[in-house]
Protein backbone atom coordinates (compact mmCIF):
# COMPACT_ATOMS: atom_id res chain seq x y z
CA UNK A 1 0.00 0.00 0.00
CA UNK A 2 1.33 3.41 -0.99
CA UNK A 3 0.69 6.55 1.04
CA UNK A 4 1.66 10.22 1.07
CA UNK A 5 2.89 11.91 4.25
CA UNK A 6 2.65 15.71 4.51
CA UNK A 7 4.34 17.79 7.18
CA UNK A 8 1.72 19.43 9.40
CA UNK A 9 3.32 22.87 8.81
CA UNK A 10 2.43 22.72 5.09
CA UNK A 11 -0.94 24.32 5.84
CA UNK A 12 -0.95 26.34 2.59
CA UNK A 13 -0.84 23.22 0.41
CA UNK A 14 -2.70 20.60 2.48
CA UNK A 15 -6.21 21.98 1.70
CA UNK A 16 -5.50 21.73 -2.06
CA UNK A 17 -3.99 18.29 -1.56
CA UNK A 18 -7.09 17.03 0.23
CA UNK A 19 -9.31 18.37 -2.56
CA UNK A 20 -7.19 16.81 -5.32
CA UNK A 21 -7.17 13.46 -3.55
CA UNK A 22 -10.91 13.69 -2.91
CA UNK A 23 -11.48 13.85 -6.67
CA UNK A 24 -9.54 10.61 -6.94
CA UNK A 25 -11.66 8.95 -4.24
CA UNK A 26 -14.78 9.79 -6.24
CA UNK A 27 -13.35 8.34 -9.44
CA UNK A 28 -15.22 5.05 -10.05
CA UNK A 29 -12.30 3.61 -12.03
CA UNK A 30 -9.97 4.05 -9.06
CA UNK A 31 -10.53 1.13 -6.72
CA UNK A 32 -7.78 1.84 -4.22
CA UNK A 33 -7.93 4.81 -1.92
CA UNK A 34 -4.83 6.97 -1.56
CA UNK A 35 -4.19 7.64 2.12
CA UNK A 36 -2.87 11.03 3.14
CA UNK A 37 -1.22 11.29 6.54
CA UNK A 38 -0.38 14.63 8.15
CA UNK A 39 2.49 14.21 10.59
CA UNK A 40 5.63 15.93 11.90
CA UNK A 41 8.50 15.42 9.47
CA UNK A 42 12.15 16.05 10.31
CA UNK A 43 13.44 15.65 6.74
CA UNK A 44 11.58 17.18 3.80
CA UNK A 45 8.01 18.46 3.59
CA UNK A 46 6.48 15.39 1.95
CA UNK A 47 7.31 11.69 1.80
CA UNK A 48 5.99 9.16 -0.68
CA UNK A 49 6.02 5.84 1.13
CA UNK A 50 5.09 2.21 0.78
CA UNK A 51 3.86 0.21 3.77
CA UNK A 52 5.07 -0.42 6.32
CA UNK A 53 7.92 2.14 6.36
CA UNK A 54 9.60 2.22 2.96
CA UNK A 55 10.49 5.74 1.79
CA UNK A 56 10.32 6.08 -1.99
CA UNK A 57 10.71 9.85 -2.36
CA UNK A 58 11.40 12.89 -0.19
CA UNK A 59 10.10 16.26 -1.40
CA UNK A 60 11.07 19.71 -0.10
CA UNK A 61 8.84 22.66 -1.10
CA UNK A 62 10.14 26.22 -1.13
CA UNK A 63 8.86 29.49 -2.52
CA UNK A 64 11.37 31.76 -4.27
CA UNK A 65 11.38 33.89 -1.11
CA UNK A 66 12.08 30.86 1.12
CA UNK A 67 14.80 29.65 -1.24
CA UNK A 68 16.48 33.06 -1.22
CA UNK A 69 16.30 33.24 2.58
CA UNK A 70 17.81 29.77 2.89
CA UNK A 71 20.77 30.87 0.76
CA UNK A 72 21.42 33.75 3.18
CA UNK A 73 21.00 32.08 6.56
CA UNK A 74 22.40 28.63 5.87
CA UNK A 75 19.16 26.61 5.76
CA UNK A 76 20.03 25.73 2.16
CA UNK A 77 22.42 23.22 3.70
CA UNK A 78 19.46 21.27 5.02
CA UNK A 79 19.86 19.38 1.77
CA UNK A 80 22.55 17.38 3.59
CA UNK A 81 19.81 15.75 5.65
CA UNK A 82 18.00 14.80 2.45
CA UNK A 83 21.20 13.45 0.91
CA UNK A 84 21.82 11.37 4.02
CA UNK A 85 18.28 10.02 3.87
CA UNK A 86 18.82 9.02 0.24
CA UNK A 87 22.08 7.27 1.12
CA UNK A 88 20.28 5.26 3.78
CA UNK A 89 17.02 4.46 1.97
CA UNK A 90 17.91 4.82 -1.74
CA UNK A 91 14.91 7.14 -2.12
CA UNK A 92 14.61 9.85 -4.77
CA UNK A 93 14.91 13.52 -3.80
CA UNK A 94 12.85 16.41 -5.17
CA UNK A 95 12.82 20.17 -4.69
CA UNK A 96 9.59 21.99 -5.55
CA UNK A 97 10.40 25.66 -6.20
CA UNK A 98 7.22 27.74 -6.18
CA UNK A 99 6.66 31.06 -7.94
CA UNK A 100 6.10 32.84 -11.28
CA UNK A 101 8.00 31.23 -14.13
CA UNK A 102 11.10 32.86 -15.59
CA UNK A 103 11.32 36.26 -13.88
CA UNK A 104 14.05 38.71 -14.89
CA UNK A 105 17.45 37.26 -13.81
CA UNK A 106 18.30 40.57 -12.11
CA UNK A 107 15.05 40.73 -10.18
CA UNK A 108 15.67 40.79 -6.43
CA UNK A 109 13.77 38.23 -4.37
CA UNK A 110 14.31 38.76 -0.65
CA UNK A 111 17.45 40.77 -1.56
CA UNK A 112 18.83 37.88 -3.67
CA UNK A 113 19.04 38.08 -7.47
CA UNK A 114 16.92 35.50 -9.28
CA UNK A 115 20.07 34.52 -11.22
CA UNK A 116 21.62 33.33 -7.93
CA UNK A 117 18.54 31.23 -7.21
CA UNK A 118 18.79 29.64 -10.68
CA UNK A 119 22.47 28.86 -10.01
CA UNK A 120 21.61 27.18 -6.70
CA UNK A 121 18.85 25.15 -8.38
CA UNK A 122 21.29 24.05 -11.09
CA UNK A 123 23.77 22.92 -8.44
CA UNK A 124 21.06 20.84 -6.80
CA UNK A 125 20.47 19.00 -10.08
CA UNK A 126 24.04 18.65 -11.36
CA UNK A 127 26.03 18.27 -8.16
CA UNK A 128 23.53 16.64 -5.80
CA UNK A 129 21.36 14.78 -8.35
CA UNK A 130 18.18 16.23 -6.83
CA UNK A 131 15.21 16.69 -9.16
CA UNK A 132 13.98 20.31 -9.26
CA UNK A 133 10.36 20.94 -10.25
CA UNK A 134 9.10 24.51 -10.66
CA UNK A 135 5.46 25.21 -9.82
CA UNK A 136 3.29 28.33 -10.05
CA UNK A 137 1.60 28.30 -6.65
CA UNK A 138 0.32 26.08 -3.82
CA UNK A 139 -2.48 24.61 -5.96
CA UNK A 140 -0.02 23.73 -8.73
CA UNK A 141 2.35 22.16 -6.18
CA UNK A 142 -0.52 19.98 -4.96
CA UNK A 143 -1.26 18.81 -8.51
CA UNK A 144 2.39 17.92 -9.09
CA UNK A 145 2.52 16.01 -5.79
CA UNK A 146 -0.47 13.90 -6.77
CA UNK A 147 1.02 13.24 -10.23
CA UNK A 148 4.32 12.24 -8.65
CA UNK A 149 2.54 10.01 -6.15
CA UNK A 150 0.73 8.16 -8.93
CA UNK A 151 3.93 7.70 -10.90
CA UNK A 152 5.49 5.95 -7.90
CA UNK A 153 2.40 3.92 -7.02
CA UNK A 154 2.37 2.37 -10.51
CA UNK A 155 5.96 1.17 -10.32
CA UNK A 156 7.75 -1.09 -7.86
CA UNK A 157 10.71 0.84 -6.50
CA UNK A 158 13.15 -1.27 -4.51
CA UNK A 159 14.41 0.57 -1.44
CA UNK A 160 15.67 -0.39 1.97
CA UNK A 161 12.96 -0.15 4.67
CA UNK A 162 14.04 1.99 7.56
CA UNK A 163 12.82 2.97 10.98
CA UNK A 164 14.10 6.38 11.98
CA UNK A 165 13.98 8.07 15.37
CA UNK A 166 15.02 11.65 16.23
CA UNK A 167 18.24 12.30 18.10
CA UNK A 168 18.31 14.26 21.34
CA UNK A 169 19.87 17.14 19.40
CA UNK A 170 17.02 17.22 16.88
CA UNK A 171 14.43 17.16 19.67
CA UNK A 172 16.26 20.00 21.42
CA UNK A 173 16.41 22.00 18.17
CA UNK A 174 12.67 21.47 17.83
CA UNK A 175 12.24 22.75 21.41
CA UNK A 176 14.09 26.00 20.66
CA UNK A 177 12.24 26.33 17.34
CA UNK A 178 8.93 26.44 19.21
CA UNK A 179 9.76 30.13 19.74
CA UNK A 180 8.60 32.47 16.98
CA UNK A 181 11.44 33.62 14.72
CA UNK A 182 13.86 30.81 15.63
CA UNK A 183 14.64 28.70 12.57
CA UNK A 184 16.20 25.25 12.59
CA UNK A 185 19.65 26.77 12.03
CA UNK A 186 19.35 29.23 14.94
CA UNK A 187 17.80 26.47 17.06
CA UNK A 188 20.81 24.25 16.36
CA UNK A 189 23.24 26.97 17.44
CA UNK A 190 21.30 27.55 20.67
CA UNK A 191 21.00 23.82 21.37
CA UNK A 192 24.78 23.49 21.15
CA UNK A 193 25.58 26.74 22.98
CA UNK A 194 23.47 26.67 26.12
CA UNK A 195 20.59 24.86 27.78
CA UNK A 196 17.17 26.33 28.52
CA UNK A 197 18.05 26.05 32.23
CA UNK A 198 21.20 28.05 31.53
CA UNK A 199 19.12 30.82 29.93
CA UNK A 200 16.18 31.04 32.36
CA UNK A 201 18.53 31.10 35.35
CA UNK A 202 20.20 34.24 33.96
CA UNK A 203 23.57 32.53 33.50
CA UNK A 204 23.82 33.54 29.83
CA UNK A 205 24.61 37.29 30.03
CA UNK A 206 23.23 39.73 27.42
CA UNK A 207 26.72 40.35 26.04
CA UNK A 208 27.03 36.64 25.20
CA UNK A 209 23.60 36.66 23.57
CA UNK A 210 24.71 39.66 21.50
CA UNK A 211 27.72 37.67 20.21
CA UNK A 212 25.62 34.85 18.74
CA UNK A 213 25.93 34.60 14.95
CA UNK A 214 24.52 32.48 12.14
CA UNK A 215 26.80 30.16 10.10
CA UNK A 216 27.13 32.97 7.53
CA UNK A 217 28.59 35.16 10.32
CA UNK A 218 25.52 37.37 10.52
CA UNK A 219 24.26 38.50 13.95
CA UNK A 220 21.10 36.90 15.26
CA UNK A 221 17.96 38.93 14.39
CA UNK A 222 17.24 41.65 16.96
CA UNK A 223 13.83 40.09 17.64
CA UNK A 224 15.49 36.80 18.62
CA UNK A 225 18.01 38.56 20.87
CA UNK A 226 15.26 40.51 22.64
CA UNK A 227 13.28 37.33 23.08
CA UNK A 228 16.22 35.46 24.63
CA UNK A 229 16.90 38.33 27.03
CA UNK A 230 13.19 38.42 27.91
CA UNK A 231 13.29 34.70 28.74
CA UNK A 232 16.29 35.23 31.00
CA UNK A 233 14.17 37.81 32.88
CA UNK A 234 11.30 35.36 33.41
CA UNK A 235 8.79 36.09 30.63
CA UNK A 236 5.97 33.63 31.43
CA UNK A 237 4.48 33.48 27.92
CA UNK A 238 7.82 32.58 26.33
CA UNK A 239 8.56 30.06 29.08
CA UNK A 240 5.28 28.29 28.27
CA UNK A 241 6.24 28.12 24.58
CA UNK A 242 9.63 26.64 25.46
CA UNK A 243 8.16 24.08 27.84
CA UNK A 244 5.60 23.06 25.22
CA UNK A 245 8.51 22.03 22.98
CA UNK A 246 9.46 19.16 25.32
CA UNK A 247 8.28 15.79 23.92
CA UNK A 248 4.76 14.88 25.15
CA UNK A 249 4.22 18.38 26.62
CA UNK A 250 1.79 20.57 24.68
CA UNK A 251 0.85 24.22 25.17
CA UNK A 252 -2.13 23.47 27.40
CA UNK A 253 -0.13 21.21 29.70
CA UNK A 254 2.79 23.67 29.76
CA UNK A 255 0.43 26.50 30.75
CA UNK A 256 -1.06 24.36 33.52
CA UNK A 257 2.39 23.46 34.87
CA UNK A 258 3.52 27.10 34.93
CA UNK A 259 0.21 28.45 36.21
CA UNK A 260 1.52 29.30 39.69
CA UNK A 261 5.32 29.24 39.34
CA UNK A 262 8.08 30.30 36.96
CA UNK A 263 10.04 27.70 35.00
CA UNK A 264 13.15 28.26 37.12
CA UNK A 265 11.24 27.18 40.24
CA UNK A 266 10.66 23.69 38.81
CA UNK A 267 14.21 23.36 37.48
CA UNK A 268 15.46 23.95 41.03
CA UNK A 269 13.20 21.18 42.39
CA UNK A 270 13.90 17.43 42.39
CA UNK A 271 12.29 15.46 39.59
CA UNK A 272 10.03 13.76 42.14
CA UNK A 273 8.47 17.12 43.09
CA UNK A 274 7.77 17.94 39.46
CA UNK A 275 6.22 14.50 38.96
CA UNK A 276 3.71 15.19 41.75
CA UNK A 277 2.32 18.40 40.21
CA UNK A 278 -1.47 18.20 40.03
CA UNK A 279 -2.88 18.73 36.53
CA UNK A 280 -6.56 19.71 36.38
CA UNK A 281 -8.62 18.02 33.70
CA UNK A 282 -12.31 18.33 32.84
CA UNK A 283 -13.56 15.66 35.23
CA UNK A 284 -10.55 14.84 37.40
CA UNK A 285 -7.10 15.85 38.58
CA UNK A 286 -4.03 13.80 37.69
CA UNK A 287 -0.32 13.94 38.47
CA UNK A 288 2.22 15.00 35.86
CA UNK A 289 4.04 11.70 36.29
CA UNK A 290 7.66 10.63 36.47
CA UNK A 291 8.18 10.06 32.73
CA UNK A 292 7.12 13.58 31.76
CA UNK A 293 8.99 15.09 34.71
CA UNK A 294 12.21 13.32 33.68
CA UNK A 295 11.77 14.46 30.08
CA UNK A 296 11.28 18.07 31.21
CA UNK A 297 14.39 18.04 33.40
CA UNK A 298 16.45 16.25 30.77
CA UNK A 299 15.64 18.41 27.74
CA UNK A 300 15.61 21.74 29.58
CA UNK A 301 19.10 20.91 30.88
CA UNK A 302 20.31 19.53 27.53
CA UNK A 303 23.19 21.20 25.74
CA UNK A 304 25.30 19.83 22.90
CA UNK A 305 28.51 20.69 24.76
CA UNK A 306 27.31 19.70 28.22
CA UNK A 307 24.24 19.49 30.39
CA UNK A 308 23.69 22.28 32.88
CA UNK A 309 22.19 22.19 36.36
CA UNK A 310 20.94 25.54 37.61
CA UNK A 311 21.78 24.92 41.26
CA UNK A 312 25.52 24.68 40.64
CA UNK A 313 28.25 26.92 39.29
CA UNK A 314 29.70 23.99 37.35
CA UNK A 315 28.30 22.05 34.45
CA UNK A 316 27.54 18.49 35.44
CA UNK A 317 26.19 15.46 33.65
CA UNK A 318 22.52 14.87 34.42
CA UNK A 319 20.90 11.47 34.48
CA UNK A 320 19.18 10.36 31.32
CA UNK A 321 15.45 9.63 31.56
CA UNK A 322 14.59 5.96 31.18
CA UNK A 323 12.05 6.81 28.46
CA UNK A 324 14.70 8.30 26.17
CA UNK A 325 17.52 5.77 26.50
CA UNK A 326 16.91 4.49 22.99
CA UNK A 327 18.28 7.69 21.45
CA UNK A 328 21.90 8.67 21.04
CA UNK A 329 23.83 10.01 24.00
CA UNK A 330 25.70 13.29 23.89
CA UNK A 331 29.12 14.06 25.38
CA UNK A 332 29.26 15.98 28.62
CA UNK A 333 32.00 18.21 29.96
CA UNK A 334 32.79 19.82 33.27
CA UNK A 335 33.76 23.48 32.99
CA UNK A 336 32.60 26.84 34.36
CA UNK A 337 29.40 28.28 32.91
CA UNK A 338 31.05 31.46 31.67
CA UNK A 339 33.45 29.37 29.57
CA UNK A 340 30.88 27.17 27.90
CA UNK A 341 28.89 30.05 26.46
CA UNK A 342 31.92 31.44 24.62
CA UNK A 343 33.63 28.21 23.54
CA UNK A 344 30.49 26.37 22.57
CA UNK A 345 29.35 29.37 20.53
CA UNK A 346 32.18 28.91 18.03
CA UNK A 347 31.67 25.13 17.99
CA UNK A 348 27.95 25.48 17.39
CA UNK A 349 28.33 27.99 14.57
CA UNK A 350 30.82 25.74 12.77
CA UNK A 351 28.67 22.69 13.40
CA UNK A 352 25.53 24.40 12.12
CA UNK A 353 27.25 25.33 8.89
CA UNK A 354 27.81 21.63 8.19
CA UNK A 355 24.27 20.71 9.39
CA UNK A 356 23.24 17.35 10.83
CA UNK A 357 24.13 14.42 8.58
CA UNK A 358 23.36 11.34 10.69
CA UNK A 359 19.87 10.71 9.45
CA UNK A 360 20.18 7.22 10.88
CA UNK A 361 18.48 8.85 13.86
CA UNK A 362 16.06 11.11 12.03
CA UNK A 363 12.40 10.33 12.16
CA UNK A 364 9.93 9.50 9.44
CA UNK A 365 7.16 11.01 11.53
CA UNK A 366 5.98 11.04 15.10
Swiss-Prot record:
SUPFAM superfamilies: Restriction endonuclease-like. The keyword Hydrolase applies. Its EC number is 3.1.4.-. Induction: Expressed in the late phase of the viral replicative cycle. It is an enzyme of class 3 (hydrolase). It holds the Pfam family ERCC4. GO terms for biological process: DNA catabolic process; double-strand break repair via break-induced replication; symbiont-mediated suppression of host innate immune response; symbiont-mediated suppression of host type I interferon-mediated signaling pathway. It comes from the Viruses. Residues 3-101 form the ERCC4 domain. One of its GO terms (cellular component) is Holliday junction resolvase complex. Keywords: Host-virus interaction, Hydrolase, Inhibition of host innate immune response by virus, Inhibition of host interferon signaling pathway by virus, Interferon antiviral system evasion, Late protein, Viral immunoevasion. GO terms for molecular function: 3'-flap endonuclease activity; crossover junction DNA endonuclease activity; DNA binding. InterPro entries: ERCC4_domain, Mus81, Restrct_endonuc-II-like. Belongs to the asfivirus EP364R family. Plays a role in the inhibition of type I interferon signaling pathway. Mechanistically, specifically interacts with 2',3'-cGAMP and cleaves it via its phosphodiesterase activity. In turn, prevents 2',3'-cGAMP interaction with host ER-resident STING1 leading to inhibition of downstream signaling pathway and type I interferon production. This is ERCC4 domain-containing protein EP364R. It comes from African swine fever virus (isolate Pig/Kenya/KEN-50/1950) (ASFV). The lineage of its organism: Viruses, Varidnaviria, Bamfordvirae, Nucleocytoviricota, Pokkesviricetes.
